[in-house]
Amino acid sequence: MNDSVFSKKRILLLGSGELGKELVIESKRLGLEVIAIDRYEKAPAMQVADYSKVIDMGDKNILKNSIKEFTPDFVVPEIEALSIEALKELEDEGFKIVPNARTVEITMNRDKIRELVSRDLKIKTANYDYIYKFEDLEKKADEIGFPLLLKPLMSSSGKGQSLVGSKNDLNQAWSQAQANSRGQVKGVIIEEFINFDFEFTLLTVRKNNGENIFCLPIGHLQSNGDYQCSWHPLEINQSLISEAKKMTTKILNNLNGSGLYGVEFFVKENEVIFSELSPRPHDTGMVTLVSQNINEFELHLRAFLNLPIPHINLIEPSATRVILSDQEHMNPIYEGLNEALEVENTKVLIFGKPISRKGRRMGVVLSSNSDINLARKNADEAARKIKVSSK
């Protein structure tokens, strides 16, 4: 077929959160058919997809049968909590997993990505080890030193992560990690706490021909491992960016699957330290909806669909601030939306989650300005005006 002819494709999305919702919207702009799957009804991406289905994605047989039911051209994981064995078997049968099943497996497990990056590729990370029994935790904590981080080997959005200040906090941190662990793995990763100067995300597009395209770096702040705000671009020494690009290229040359990757780094005393990697659009990258000519969701699609990706341009410096719920609500409503939208050059995205919980991310504010500090100030101001409540 002529390369200039684009036929309609069917995409099946595994996980239907807010990032998946934006991916569906961009997919529909290209005339694609989308099936959104998640473990609960009325998930954000389901609200804009052609079809949806609620299943237990951790059950290998259920997941395999559901994917075969829809016969998609591409299977696109958006979350970590799914059966990797199902994806491996489906890939062997000819289904296209984005970016590939091996990459999904490595990046969904903190032990596997650390072993690849630190042990195999010799890239700088925080000191770490794995613990599977609480009895071994105290000894290893003394070796790592306090403060330290304790995380489930598998979780998402920072869930179950604790900053541990002393031995007295280990029991609670262990319990929290176990309670928030996803999948069958119940171990934890114990990690040196790096008192970094700042952290950033390097969105990287991997094309089918192996070429990597880098977006400008995105600054961000997290709380307990969960994204709170981001700004784009981040002012940073070019030598640090060059080092981050070298690290990213080394990792992606090993993983070798097309799509968009969100690669997180720490910087401490002019040293770049690898933090985490996601083989999909990144929460900090939602800022690209207003900051770039091609946002991260469209970049992901173009990459795995093998569509052209011209030069990525910055439209205007921009910032985000998340909208959090302070308690649980069924069918939540949003107070202060009018006041928030009065803030100059500001947009509000409400994700449409059917239930709110304390600390749950329910929306995001996007703000643009030629002065990045003013963009950040406006995003913060608008987000403060919005309160999640119920009737």
From Swiss-Prot:
The GO terms this record gives for MF are:
ATP binding; magnesium ion binding; phosphoribosylglycinamide formyltransferase 2 activity; phosphoribosylglycinamide formyltransferase activity
Could you tell me what reaction this enzyme catalyses? N(1)-(5-phospho-beta-D-ribosyl)glycinamide + formate + ATP = N(2)-formyl-N(1)-(5-phospho-beta-D-ribosyl)glycinamide + ADP + phosphate + H(+)
In this chain, N(1)-(5-phospho-beta-D-ribosyl)glycinamide is annotated as bound at 18-19, 78, 283, 353, 360-361
- Residues binding ATP, per UniProt: 110, 151, 156-161, 191-194, 199
Q: Hydrolase among the record's keywords?
A: no
Recorded hits in InterPro entries, A to Z, give: ATP-grasp, ATP-grasp_carboxylate-amine, ATP_grasp_subdomain_1, PreATP-grasp_dom_sf, PurT, PurT/PurK_preATP-grasp, PurT_C, Rudment_hybrid_motif
Domain ATP-grasp, by residue range, is 115-305
Instruction: Tell me the Pfam families matching this sequence.
Output: ATP-grasp (PF02222), PurT_C (PF21244), RS_preATP-grasp-like (PF22660)
This protein's pathway:
Purine metabolism; IMP biosynthesis via de novo pathway; N(2)-formyl-N(1)-(5-phospho-D-ribosyl)glycinamide from N(1)-(5-phospho-D-ribosyl)glycinamide (formate route): step 1/1
Asked whether the UniProt record includes ATP-binding among its keywords, one would answer: yes
Keywords attached to this entry? ATP-binding, Ligase, Magnesium, Metal-binding, Nucleotide-binding, Purine biosynthesis
**EC numbers, comma separated:** 6.3.1.21
Source organism's superkingdom? Bacteria
Annotated binding of Mg(2+), by residue: 264, 276
Q: Which cellular component terms (GO) are annotated to the entry? A: cytosol
Among the GO biological process terms of this entry, one is: 'de novo' IMP biosynthetic process
Its biological function? Involved in the de novo purine biosynthesis. Catalyzes the transfer of formate to 5-phospho-ribosyl-glycinamide (GAR), producing 5-phospho-ribosyl-N-formylglycinamide (FGAR). Formate is provided by PurU via hydrolysis of 10-formyl-tetrahydrofolate.
Can you state the subunit structure given in the record?
Answer: Homodimer.
Q: Into which family does the record put it? A: Belongs to the PurK/PurT family.
Q: What is this protein called?
A: Formate-dependent phosphoribosylglycinamide formyltransferase
- Native organism: Prochlorococcus marinus (strain MIT 9312)
